[in-house]
Amino acid sequence: MIRKLTILAACLTTVLAICAQKRDKYEFKRNLPVYADSLIADLTYPLAWGNSDITDFGEWKRAARQKVFDCMLPPPPRPEGGYKAKVIFEEQRDGYKARKLEIQLSRYYTVPAYVLIPDGKGPFPAVNVLHDHGAHLFIGKEKVISPLACEDSTVIRDANEWAAGYEGQFYGDYLAKNGFVVLATDAPMWGERGQMEGARRDRYDMIAGNMMMYGIDMSAYMTYDDIAATEFLASMPEVDKGRIGCTGWSMGAYRAWMLAALSDYIKAAVPVCWMITTDEQMSFKYQRTENGGFANCFPGLRRWLDYPHIASIACPCAMLFINGAQDKLFPVAGVQKAFDIMHQTWESQGVGDRLVTEIWDMPHSCPREAQRRALEFFKKHL
């Protein structure tokens, strides 16, 4: 016993010594460089609408969109013969059918997905519902659509627990009950696109870094997949391809406005709780320990455009942004600054009424009322 205690004490001493190792001089603190303010001051966003010397809005959109794609690095190669889907399972729900699919979105891989199709005669309007991050990678599509009966009981239980963040209501099922075809896919590293060793948040950044060694960007692959999945959605016979929207909250909101900016199929979008400016996101003043990360990182893009400038590429798309006044991830000062930039863009094109921005008295969340507001917006614009 004494020998075991001695070994344990030695191990603890070693661990504490390693954790406590510090030098008098350093260059990084709280995961940011000490010269972060200087980096921010050097960001002038020369390609932003109003900063760029391009004065024709259509020409600017094409140039800005191409710059985003350039910074996203190469896309995954499209599958030969177009997108193909295999139906894995189907079940009837209250007013709509639910299917589990495997969609060949790339020559490299298939993407697991759920699709919900309302009963009755189509074609129907459709919404690509994009799941969040939540530092929880075990489930993806199951965060926004109730798992089908073919899934493991652990997946079903986990999804039901996660739905508590939506006040017990699955966002996708809610839209399907109200007449929309709904698609939800797993993003890379989530759900059935995760690690063989199991879902571990601490491995995400390491894998993203490894992917960059292949000359590709994992965050970009997520966006490329969202674009491809929307193209697949538009090809479904049950879908009116002229009436497609997208929505999501947290990382799903980021995915939604990125998709609206980069895909002409999107006619309306509702991002909930993800919009800010880089000067507020990457600042020391909010005492955060995580400021962004690989989930929304395209190399070099910030030298040209900030988040609201990228979202502005979507104009004149109808968009409703909802953020929370109590959201500690997205401080109101940065949110409002971003909203103001976007409003200037929509108003410059005479379509100011097609951009709605709201700050609610809520934390980082997507309650039933936000889902109801999104449904109302989609009914109006799709």
Where are these regions (language model features)?
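N-terminal cap/lid segment of alpha/beta-hydrolase-fold proteins
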Residues: 70-122, 126-128
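Cap/lid segment of the alpha/beta-hydrolase catalytic domain
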Residues: 122, 129-224, 234-235, 280-283
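Mobile cap/lid helix-loop segments that gate and shape the active-site cleft of serine hydrolases
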Residues: 206, 210-213, 228, 268-311, ...
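Alpha/beta-hydrolase fold nucleophile elbow
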Residues: 238-250
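Glycine-rich nucleophile elbow surrounding the catalytic serine of serine-hydrolase chemistry
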Residues: 248-260
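C-terminal catalytic histidine-bearing segment of alpha/beta-hydrolase fold enzymes
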Residues: 340-382
